[in-house]
């Protein structure tokens, strides 16, 4: 439960106006720092919800698949250039961001992950790194400004951030194939 | 069968003491380390005397040559040699001997390091590399200087991979067991070293063609940024090496127990994951980064203080418990029960105490406004002679009093203990004078990396002289400390009486909780570290590359 409290503190901190203003002023920080931190805040708060609503999770997310699909949908949605723009200009979308990333992505991710079979986990690793790779290509190669609010050079920076994220996930995935954790335990 | 053989091997190793071949490897590293300390210390003394206006250096060996050699030899070479020697001995002791393959890698690394040092020192003496240990372009050294650096980095890599191989092989043979804590520190320190060396390797590979004249210009800001991703990280590696001795050996020496195995491992993980982007706090005054970015890096930098504060908490808890076990009463009674007259405790203890002002100064200067006051002044030199020159180095000295006798199957005499206490006090007092004077005169505006000058008898500059005089007194005491320490090390190596010295490894408390398994998931931690590094570096690097001004041609300012 201590974790849930930390998650709540992080959640509130991220929503403080000066913090959002600073985080959203740089495109790469908006997408690669603020948004993942919202997801992490949600993951930290998960035990609270699992304790409060045990039936909800066992009924709707018994094998983890619905949860992980919800997670993927939310993540994909927030990767579109258009949604970033709208979060900056339309308050309702900004609020949706504050709600969706922790509670519709972070919570289901943590609840699902332990329930998933290795095969499904592998699919998630591969598709996430592929999607990030595609986003990298999109943001680096696009000759046009994709967001009204961010310059082209920021867009390219974000693209390189995606290169590293895709690489991290992929290397981690490869590592799980070669290093059998149980062998070392 | 294999496992049985290995446990037997480990048992014999523990009762018979160190494997002779492993001991020879470490002793070679340590001997060279202390020879390097002697040379570097002598150069430091010359600098101190020059800055006080007491000594004019000849043209053929000027201040900047000496300063470059002092910096490289002490911050890079001495520390590297010590780390490899110490951790290879730790692996040998805690993992039941080095694998023959790994021992060979240790020797190869030694050869690479020596080659690198020869290149670097030769070019400095020839006056072709007075670029300081930071080798910032557009100052350009001889290409052979940079090639020497490549050898040094290669030596670090080979020794690091050796550590990983030995640890992995132990884990395979000991399923379900945690890597012994000291070896865990070794793995963490080398992972951090390798991560930190990526940027500088890229930088040096750009500098070499530029120094040969194959490329005309160099991206100055990019080079500085890549340098500090390394320079910052490696200093934190030295700190982690010292911390490993505090956690694992000091509690044993004072008759206490390990405070918490989990907490110690968490400190290692946090240090590895959070460290590299801290490099930006060396570039607070650099142009080319936006204000918002610099602001964010203040947090990055402060987050590194977290593991340090955890360490302080841990150590004081250990001291208090050990003191109370010996019957100490009252709030601070345990303080008196500590073995102050045992140099194996006194040296690391003073090292830890020095870290209190050193850490406070560090937290201060990582803030933009305060940094503007002290940037490039002697304050900064005072700061790292406390962190590195005292906290790290005194801990290294403290380790020598048991590590060398352990390796040579000798015993420290009470005479050497007494001499060691004198050495520690000389060092502490010398540093109090030198570093204190540097801090103060730095705030008054005296710049670092500047040989003696009164700026045409300018009144402000003349006002620095009394402080610089104290700096020279401190420097002289420190050199006395260096002589004593080198004497002690070689005395323990060759002349101390034969006997048995144990490798002090603290036991966990009887009611200690089990260490969680996530501490062993290095695959995950390395990936997290890479993710944090890319979060810190992608934005400025892309900006520095895509919006680069035309590069700079070389300059030879000396
Ligand atoms: C005998 C002991 C020592 C003395 C007298 C001494 C003295 C000095 C002085 C006077 C400076 C130059 C200040 C300037 O002009 O900027 C300096 C720089 C430096 N010292 Fe020491 N020092 C000693 C030991 C150490 C040790 C043990 C270390 C590290 C392990 C160390 C690391 C450095 C570094 C990294 C620099 C900066 C070089 C540069 O700015 O490029 N020193 N030292
Ligand atoms: Cu630093």
Please place each PLM-identified region on the residue numbering.
Chain A
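Alpha-helical membrane segments of multi-pass proteins
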Residues: 1-185
């Amino acid at each position: 439960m201590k974790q849930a409290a930390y998650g709540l503190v992080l959640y509130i901190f991220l929503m403080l106006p000066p913090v959002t203003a600073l985080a959203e002023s740089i495109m790469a920080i908006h997408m690669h720092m603020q948004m993942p931190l919202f997801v992490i805040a949600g993951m930290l708060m998960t035990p609270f919800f699992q304790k409060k609503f045990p039936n909800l999770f066992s009924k709707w997310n018994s094998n983890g698949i619905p949860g992980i699909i919800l997670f993927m949908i939310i993540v994909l949605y927030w990767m579109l250039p258009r949604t970033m723009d709208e979060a900056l200009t339309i308050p309702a979308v900004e609020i949706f961001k504050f709600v969706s990333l922790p509670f519709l992505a972070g919570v289901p991710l943590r609840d699902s992950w332990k329930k998933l079979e290795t095969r499904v986990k592998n699919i998630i690793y591969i598709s996430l790194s592929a999607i990030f790779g595609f986003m990298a290509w999109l943001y680096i190669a696009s000759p046009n400004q994709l967001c009204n609010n961010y310059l082209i050079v920021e867009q390219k920076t974000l693209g390189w951030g995606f290169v590293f994220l895709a690489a991290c996930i992929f290397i981690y995935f490869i590592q799980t194939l070669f290093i059998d954790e149980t062998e070392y335990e | 069968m294999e496992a049985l053989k290995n446990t037997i091997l480990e048992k014999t190793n523990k009762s018979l003491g160190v494997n002779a071949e492993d001991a020879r490897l470490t002793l070679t590293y340590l001997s060279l380390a202390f020879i390097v300390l002697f040379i570097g210390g002598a150069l430091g003394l010359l600098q101190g005397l020059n800055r006080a206006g007491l000594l004019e250096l000849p043209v053929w060996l000027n201040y900047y040559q000496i300063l470059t050699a002092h910096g490289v030899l002490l911050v890079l070479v001495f520390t590297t040699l010590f780390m490899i020697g110490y951790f290879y001995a730790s692996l040998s002791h805690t993992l039941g001997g080095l694998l023959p393959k790994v021992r060979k890698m240790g020797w190869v690394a030694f050869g690479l390091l020596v080659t690198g040092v020869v290149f670097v020192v030769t070019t400095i003496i020839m006056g072709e590399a007075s670029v300081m240990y930071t080798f910032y372009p557009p100052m350009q050294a001889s290409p052979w200087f940079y090639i020497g650096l490549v050898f040094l980095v290669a030596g670090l890599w080979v020794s690091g991979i050796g550590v990983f191989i030995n640890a992995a092989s132990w884990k395979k043979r000991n399923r379900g067991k945690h890597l012994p804590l000291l070896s865990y520190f070794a793995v963490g320190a080398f992972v951090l070293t390798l991560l930190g060396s990526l940027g500088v390797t890229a930088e040096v590979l750009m500098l070499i063609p530029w120094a040969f004249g194959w490329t005309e210009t160099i991206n100055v800001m990019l080079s500085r940024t890549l340098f500090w991703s390394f320079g910052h990280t490696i200093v934190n590696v030295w700190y982690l090496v010292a911390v490993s001795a505090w956690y694992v050996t000091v509690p044993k020496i004072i008759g206490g127990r390990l405070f918490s195995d989990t907490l110690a491992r968490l400190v290692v993980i946090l240090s590895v994951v959070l460290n590299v982007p801290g490099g930006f706090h060396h570039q607070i005054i650099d142009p080319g980064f936006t204000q918002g970015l610099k602001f964010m890096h203040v947090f990055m930098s402060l987050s590194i203080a977290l593991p340090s504060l955890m360490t302080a908490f841990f150590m004081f808890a250990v001291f208090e418990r050990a003191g109370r076990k010996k019957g100490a009463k009252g709030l601070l009674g345990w303080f008196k029960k500590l073995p102050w007259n045992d140099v194996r405790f006194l040296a690391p203890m003073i090292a830890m105490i020095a870290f209190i002002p050193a850490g406070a100064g560090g937290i201060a200067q990582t803030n933009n406004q305060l940094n503007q006051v002290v940037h490039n002044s002697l304050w900064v030199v005072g700061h790292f002679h406390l962190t590195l020159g005292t906290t790290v180095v005194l801990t290294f000295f403290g380790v020598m009093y048991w590590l060398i006798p352990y390796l040579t199957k000798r015993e420290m005499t009470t005479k050497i203990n007494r001499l060691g206490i004198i050495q520690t006090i000389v060092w502490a007092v010398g540093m109090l004078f030198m570093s204190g004077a540097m801090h103060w005169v730095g705030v008054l505006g005296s710049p670092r990396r500047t040989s003696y000058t009164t700026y045409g008898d300018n009144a402000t500059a003349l006002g620095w002289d009394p402080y610089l005089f104290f700096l020279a007194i401190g420097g002289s005491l420190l050199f006395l400390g260096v002589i004593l320490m080198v004497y002690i090390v070689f005395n323990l190596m060759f002349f101390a009486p034969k006997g048995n010295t144990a490798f002090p490894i603290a036991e966990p408390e009887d009611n200690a909780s089990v260490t969680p398994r996530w501490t062993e998931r290095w695959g995950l931690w390395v990936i997290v570290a890479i993710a944090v590094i890319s979060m810190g570096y992608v934005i400025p690097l892309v900006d520095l590359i895509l919006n680069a001004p035309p590069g700079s041609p070389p300059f030879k300012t000396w």
